[in-house]
Structure formats: structure tokens, C-alpha cells
Amino acid sequence: MKTLLLTLVVVTIVCLDLGYTMTCCNQQSSQPKTTTICAGGESSCYKKTWSDHRGSRTERGCGCPHVKPGIKLTCCKTDECNN
């Protein structure tokens, strides 16, 4: 009986997604707000801004990438914190 109970507990834990998934904004520049659910293991969101011949540009997404000089990067660790 104990084995059956233990098996049910293990199956329940495996079947349920007990991990937390981060939600980040992913709209570009001045587009309407959209969000994405980040891949497992991602624990931060980013907002990258720079200027080019089209004006000020913004990119948002999951993670915290490395950027070239001249690009402003803001990383944060709460849901939709990169809006």
C-alpha cells in the first residue's frame, strides 16, 4: 500500500509543472504590448534600446543578452518588468 501511494505521489509530481515560468514583454519599439512565456530556466527579461537611421529602436524579450557598445540594456527579474 505504501508503495502504491509513493508511486502516485511521484507520478503526480512528474505530471505537474512545478517550475515557475517567467513572462516577459516582447513587443518591438512602439508596437502594442505583447508578452511571451519564457523557456524553462530563463529567470530574467530584457529591454534593449538604441538609435539608428530610423530613430530610436527598442527590443524586448527573455533572458539578458550581451550587447555591443552604444546599446542600452536593462535586465530585470519580475514578470513583464521590461515594458
Curated annotation (Swiss-Prot):
- CDD domains linked: TFP_snake_toxin
SS bond list: C24-C45, C38-C62, C64-C75, C76-C81
Q: In which tissues is it expressed?
A: Expressed by the venom gland.
Which terms does the record give in the GO molecular function aspect? acetylcholine receptor inhibitor activity; ion channel regulator activity; toxin activity
Say what the protein does: Binds to muscle nicotinic acetylcholine receptor (nAChR) and inhibit acetylcholine from binding to the receptor, thereby impairing neuromuscular transmission.
What family does the Swiss-Prot or TrEMBL record give for this protein?
Belongs to the three-finger toxin family. Short-chain subfamily. Type I alpha-neurotoxin sub-subfamily.
Know the name of this protein?
Short neurotoxin 1
Which organism does this record belong to? Answer: Pseudechis australis (Mulga snake)
